[in-house]
Amino acid sequence: MIRSRSVLLIFRKVLYQSSCLKCLLCANSFSTSVSSSLGFRATNKELNQMIRSGYIAEARDIFEKLEARNTVTWNTMISGYVKRREMNQARKLFDVMPKRDVVTWNTMISGYVSCGGIRFLEEARKLFDEMPSRDSFSWNTMISGYAKNRRIGEALLLFEKMPERNAVSWSAMITGFCQNGEVDSAVVLFRKMPVKDSSPLCALVAGLIKNERLSEAAWVLGQYGSLVSGREDLVYAYNTLIVGYGQRGQVEAARCLFDQIPDLCGDDHGGEFRERFCKNVVSWNSMIKAYLKVGDVVSARLLFDQMKDRDTISWNTMIDGYVHVSRMEDAFALFSEMPNRDAHSWNMMVSGYASVGNVELARHYFEKTPEKHTVSWNSIIAAYEKNKDYKEAVDLFIRMNIEGEKPDPHTLTSLLSASTGLVNLRLGMQMHQIVVKTVIPDVPVHNALITMYSRCGEIMESRRIFDEMKLKREVITWNAMIGGYAFHGNASEALNLFGSMKSNGIYPSHITFVSVLNACAHAGLVDEAKAQFVSMMSVYKIEPQMEHYSSLVNVTSGQGQFEEAMYIITSMPFEPDKTVWGALLDACRIYNNVGLAHVAAEAMSRLEPESSTPYVLLYNMYADMGLWDEASQVRMNMESKRIKKERGSSWVDSST
């Protein structure tokens, strides 16, 4: 007996520490042979541990080979299937189980309810009605199930029939009312409670907040907070309201509530209520998040420094706050002090350095990340994509697949953007196949597909995807398709689609008008462009940005209307950038407008003194006109300033 127990312990160690399947099966075989000698408790414990470790098939094999099973053995196996939502397997065992107890019935009922949907709820109700005896868990599970499925009337009927209600029953019913928008009924029900408890109070406060009734939530908390039983749990209601205020930017109200909670349990505030009610780590974390929500990093850090007990969330929240305001030195300092880092800590450093353009440091932290998850890969792939290093983004995706990590919608969106940047139709189509095979119903992914196909020359495929999206279209979807037509110079389709967008009640954004104005520029539709520009400001109240002015200069100067173009430039509410002057200079070359070309070139040189673009454009304009002396002078000026010609630009050969 002692020998068998010792050997079984060794095999158990192998079972839970080894990844060798042969060792696992060997341990299973041995466990079966000695289960009777060790009793049900050891066997059930082993089954449970195997199921928790993900070896449910092997656990079932042991279960089938056992010479004897008790109710707990059956319940353990059924519970394993329920947790994996394999309700068919669980039901088969349930139906042949020789003797069930209330735990068996409750496990099946909660499993059906957790699966969601009316069909599973009806199965749960059938079992509930067949139960020989019910406990409060049985009733509460069914009440919650009906409430979550918007059948609040049936939930209330069960609640009223319930022989003995507890705090969970009242909480379930209050939560159900709030989830279904019947907030007043929730308040009335809470007031009917014979003995107020902190759990239903927390449920009511949370429900009021979700229904945007924060002032009422604060009143309820103030009115009943000192009267409820279970006062040590009252802090959860306060924390919920602090989070509610914080999410809505009401940081002063959040801080006022935070300060009402005693710092320490058992301080000298007096009374039993105060002794059992104090701030916990969630209170501090919630208040720090509230400050960071409004960008008050200083107040958040002061509070963080006052914390006596911090958890990983505390550190990550503060680091994330620094990352969001691009204070990477502070983020690095805090990260270096952090005692226990998790995957999120490392991912924040990767995305943080990427957001400030330091891809090298982002890559450094990525490579040092102990356990790389999908989010880790997404962060570094997105970093290279945003930095326009599309090839490295693709190489990382290939490595991600080799290392066995599956892509998600964020991965595919970045890769589709990389395909667009590389103008690589084949790569984009491969990404599209992954989307189809994984059946990812993600709007941003499909938006990226529309852009990718249009930029790679397959505008018809873009339109096919756009048409298939139908009711799932958002403003970005319309922008992508209109932008695709504009990119291809198809102004009529772009403008027609813009009209459909408005008739479908989709409010255009500033990006929409950039695409519309670009479409007008491609087609030389000056009057249409002016009308759309005016409409953008007067009808949609969108303030013109640099891109809009650049497009308007492009369309007017492109049609030889240089006075109009200069009027637009001089009347802009901000200094024109290189895109504006570049559009004018391009038009000057087409129309041989030497005087205005000099103005545009000089303006571009002031903005980017080391750029060769204005010199090359000016040189080529003189060359086109046969003015070789002037062209040579431009080249000499450029060489005297030691400006090197950028890759991709070329001189017109003087020998031709």
Curated annotation (Swiss-Prot):
Localization, UniProt: Mitochondrion
Domain of life: Eukaryota
Keywords (A to Z) from UniProt: Mitochondrion, Repeat, Transit peptide
Location (main, coarse): mitochondrion
Pfam family, one: PPR_1
Classification via InterPro entries: E_motif, Pentatricopeptide_rpt, PPR_At4g14850-like_plant, TPR-like_helical_dom_sf
A cellular-component GO term for this protein: mitochondrion
Positions of PPR repeats: 70-104, 105-134, 135-169, 170-200, 203-227, 234-264, 280-310, 311-345, 346-372, 373-407, 408-438, 442-472, 474-508, 509-544, 545-575
SUPFAM superfamilies xref list: TPR-like
GO annotation, biological process: cytidine to uridine editing
Sample GO molecular function, one term: RNA binding
PROSITE patterns: PPR (PS51375)
Region called Type E motif, residue ranges: 580-655
PANTHER family: PENTATRICOPEPTIDE REPEAT-CONTAINING PROTEIN
Family: Belongs to the PPR family. PCMP-E subfamily.
Protein known as: Pentatricopeptide repeat-containing protein At1g62260, mitochondrial
Originating organism: Arabidopsis thaliana
Gene name tied to this protein: PCMP-E10
